[in-house]
């Protein structure tokens, strides 16, 4: 069973509610039809102009049976959501009138549905930019109490258990959101990646914070090393509930014999299934190298660290990409 198949199966069992704010888009509607057909969600909310959604569905021959269309401009929740949004943003100088206008936007309205418990998961990005999706998430939903940083991860399936990880599966983080994380942000990313490991891989995380240096081999003057080292100190200070170590080079993290030589007292020997990269460049290059130069499958990026589950799509996504992202995001909502 592939990772996507396992996520869809788990979503069927979880039976959570999904909100889709790009419901005037043909791919979104086709994905919603498949989600209903496969029973992946308990309920599917389509947010947008009702007339435009139905026109798109009619033009494309998509049956909207068993889906709920919500038009923000006439929704019974519009005033309540506008007031809530105003309370969240008034420190930025927003007026109640502007809040009401902003709540006409399907993306913001869907995010508020998620925030207020009317849905369990949100997926967007087929039309909206990543920046807009992240902004809606951060301004309306916010991050988990335990972290201050929203980030992302990939699930990497190397299709080769001999390479390590958990049955050949790894979490790579952060590969899509924060260009140059601070030490505090790196610690947050490690915590979120550990939770993603539990959610997606189903095993206890063993986290390696990566660097070009292993335990001081690169000296003590480079800020890039010091940030990772400080992140490790912060994790110790937080008394996190997962095994971790750093700073470590990749081979010292993954190859037990090299770990024993370069970091003989490391608690992670032979057990790493979660890799935290020092910056976005290394993370993005790293996952693409593994994907393109081996027989690995890369799934993601999946957002992590938000108070409620939401996912960002590539604007070039296929219908099945949307279905997969929805299944993953619904699985993230299970247990929250």
Swiss-Prot record:
Family: Belongs to the phosphate acetyltransferase and butyryltransferase family.
Pathway: Metabolic intermediate biosynthesis; acetyl-CoA biosynthesis; acetyl-CoA from acetate: step 2/2
Record-linked SUPFAM superfamilies: Isocitrate/Isopropylmalate dehydrogenase-like
Top-level taxon: Bacteria
Keyword Ion transport: no
Top-level class of the enzyme under EC nomenclature: transferase
Keywords in alphabetical order: Acyltransferase, Cytoplasm, Transferase
Entry's EC annotation: 2.3.1.8
One GO term (biological process): acetyl-CoA biosynthetic process
Organism of provenance: Treponema pallidum (strain Nichols)
Localization, UniProt: Cytoplasm
Protein name, UniProt field: Phosphate acetyltransferase
Reaction(s) catalysed by this chain's protein: acetyl-CoA + phosphate = acetyl phosphate + CoA
InterPro entries per record: P_Ac_Bu_trans, P_AcTrfase, P_AcTrfase_dom1, P_AcTrfase_dom2, Phos_Acetyltrans/Butyryltrans, PTA_PTB
A GO MF label: phosphate acetyltransferase activity
Keyword Cytoplasm listed: yes
Pfam families membership: PTA_PTB (PF01515)
GO CC terms in record: cytoplasm
